Regions:
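A short, flexible loop at the N-terminus of ABC-type nucleotide-binding domains that lies
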Residues: 1, 9-21, 71
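Short coil-to-helix segment of the ABC ATPase nucleotide-binding domain corresponding to the Q-loop/switch region
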Residues: 95-103
Length: 230
């Protein structure tokens, strides 16, 4: 699903690589943590996957496509294969929960009836079916994050990227969020969780890639998840 082949990224007006010789593969349906301190290169790696940046050297493949070779008009189609969950939720305050979840599907060719069925299914999945007509300001942080998950999944993505998904919610809600993402992975969807919360990573014992100063310093399989490097 994701392939980085000896990828280096150097930004303009910088002599220091943001990423250097990054090489890894993520299978379809795999659940992977990406960890590292601020400045380790996590954000740059995500930008390469999303094709917001291009590699200086090497190749980035997403779902079999070389992102650097994609024509600009094809980039939106690549991104529609992804569901993004942001730390700050990014819900539209003037839309209800239902409307927020349905929003991304309106730009596709999905019919109104199918959208309704899909949104209702997603809200049941995240246990928010009774909040469909509520506006974001009346939701707790954990509820807003679950709406963000439902929205990310609504258009049936092949890849879900969660960027610090527990950063703005309490520890109990963080555990619920990770359990929800595990259920997403069990649906055959590739899940990449970017986080700096090492205790959470150890608890869920999944494959963990650790970045430090732009390089991968460890890539630990799930069965040995407790050995995460900091």
């Amino acid at each position: 699903m994701i392939d980085f082949e000896h990828v280096t990224k150097i930004y303009k007006r910088s002599d220091t690589p943001a990423l250097e010789d990054i090489d890894f593969h993520v299978d379809h349906g795999e659940f992977v943590f990406l960890v590292g301190h601020s400045g380790a290169g996590k954000s740059t790696l995500l930008k390469l996957i999303l094709r917001e940046e291009l590699p200086t050297e090497g190749r980035v493949m997403v779902d079999g496509k070389d992102v650097a070779r994609l024509r600009r008009c094809k980039v939106p189609f690549l991104r529609r294969q992804m569901g993004i969950i942001f730390q700050d939720f990014r819900l539209i305050p003037t839309m209800t929960v239902y409307e927020n979840v349905a929003f991304a599907m309106h730009v596709t060719n999905i019919g109104r009836k199918d959208i309704k069925e899909r949104v209702n299914y997603m809200l049941e999945l995240v246990h928010l079916e009774d909040k469909a007509k509520v506006y974001p300001e009346f939701l707790s942080g954990g509820e807003q994050q679950r709406v963000a998950v439902a929205r990310a999944l609504a258009h049936s993505p092949r890849l879900v990227i969660a960027d610090e998904p527990t950063g703005n919610i309490d520890p109990e809600m963080s555990l619920e969020m990770m359990e929800l993402l595990e259920r997403v992975s069990e649906m055959g969807i590739t899940v990449l969780v970017v986080t700096h919360e090492h205790e959470l990573v150890r608890r869920f014992n999944r494959r963990t890639i650790t970045l430090k100063q732009g390089r991968i310093i460890s890539d630990v399989p799930a069965s040995f998840g407790e050995e995460v490097h900091v």
